[in-house]
């Protein structure tokens, strides 16, 4: 399953560049959990949708550049640099992501770890 799980995550990361909430949401299970650490946890597809809509509001471009990927079974970890332009600001942020993928290729859990202070310095 590791190769398929890696492809799901790679496709998911690539989908963000289209800024299409429907496409992004199609990757999640209904009861998925998204934790953009250190932010609050988003539980369930409806709450995740609202969170992602908030992230994309004012965003004119976004790209997840995957630097490294490791997978064991249905768990995929990736080191990324997420770059986006929103509200007149350009942000480039190192991120470590952990994804749990179901056997049918949906994301049931997604945790991203990043330095909030680094982000805040770039958006001020």
Regions found by a protein language model. Give the residues of each.
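A solvent-exposed, acidic/Ser-Thr-rich amphipathic alpha-helical stretch
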Residues: 21-73
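Short beta-strand edge/turn micro-motifs at domain boundaries
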Residues: 98-121
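Hydrophobic/aromatic beta-strand elements that line small-molecule binding cavities or substrate pockets
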Residues: 52, 64-69, 81-82, 94-100
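Short, low-complexity N-terminal intrinsically disordered segments enriched in polar/charged residues
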Residues: 1-30, 122-124
């Amino acid at each position: 399953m590791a190769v398929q799980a890696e492809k799901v995550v790679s496709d998911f990361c690539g989908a963000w560049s289209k800024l299409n909430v429907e496409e992004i949401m199609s990757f999640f299970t209904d009861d998925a959990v998204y934790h953009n650490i250190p932010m609050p946890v988003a539980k369930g597809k409806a709450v995740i949708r609202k969170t992602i809509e908030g992230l994309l509001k004012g965003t004119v471009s976004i790209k997840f550049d995957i630097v490294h990927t490791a997978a064991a079974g249905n768990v995929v970890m990736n080191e990324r640099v997420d770059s986006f332009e929103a509200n007149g600001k350009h942000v480039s942020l190192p991120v470590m992501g952990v994804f749990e993928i179901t056997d049918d290729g949906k994301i049931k859990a997604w945790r991203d770890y990043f330095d909030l202070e680094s982000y805040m310095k770039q958006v001020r």
